[in-house]
């Protein structure tokens, strides 16, 4: 673990190494993963970055290409159930371009989901992490892993 070597660590971006939603009973369909009562939002994601020792994280479990279309900070859903909507397949005009939900991948997510802003959200989060680290731990080592969404579809 990085922590045993006194590294302060972060992972921002897509996380394809687990990140399963904690069950609260039986499983539901992936499309309704956020609003159903079959998940326990008081517990962090199972096998999220925090599980393997990252000090900070802000992730999406499927990147920009699959539900849930929401960020999770340090293992916990960032939005509330009141701010969840079903994203249907389609194209959604956004200030920075066209956000897309691909055929076969409708699903729930944050009402403010915008795949075109994804990378800049992660870049800004990384800058904040680095600024904080240099201000508060400038003599300590750090590890920063950023998994941007630009290498994946959908693109527009």
Regions found by a protein language model. Give the residues of each.
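Formylglycine-dependent sulfatase
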Residues: 1-156
